[in-house]
Amino acid sequence: GLTNVELTAKVRAKEEKIATAIQAYLKEAGITMNVEVIDNGVWTSSRSEGSLQATIVGWFPLYADADNQMYTYYYSENAVGKGVFYNNPEFDALMTEARQTVGDDAKREELYKQADYILSREDYATIPLYYPKLQFVAKPYVKNAKLGNLVYHLYNIDIDLSKK
């Protein structure tokens, strides 16, 4: 097992509670994680410079596809510009092949699963913690507003103001 592992997570104030919870879980595993709350501007410049050993980033994908979640931030040509600094040629090759796979959804899915395994279980470049629950509230006179997995479907809304 690991011994004498220590890391520092520099986080913004809004992530302090999450970082503190992670700190407690890691302590149980024998890993010391120091939590340092820093100003958002300092955090942003530190991330751009690649000087954050560990941090917490909230990100909500634009659409539910593995490509959007992994290629955008972790493909080596994109990673530095996104403040991630990840580079793994095997991961890149899987991403490239998956992006070029057309008409074979099962093969494409398997390639993304392999890439995800490398990213989150071999290299630990990212450790997804949770997806926040989306809330949607509408008055009774608003009909056909729907909440999908990741997006609001607002294109077919009916509003009957006479029932207001």
Predicted regions and their residues:
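Residue-level "edge-of-site" marker
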Residues: 10, 39, 60
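Early extracytoplasmic/lumenal segment of secretory-pathway proteins
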Residues: 32-45
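Short helix-capping segments at alpha-helix termini
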Residues: 1, 27-31
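Short gly/pro-enriched beta-turn/loop segments at secondary-structure junctions
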Residues: 2-4, 122
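Short, well-ordered beta-strand elements
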Residues: 4-12, 33-36, 53
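Detector for C-terminal structural segments
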Residues: 13-28, 45-164
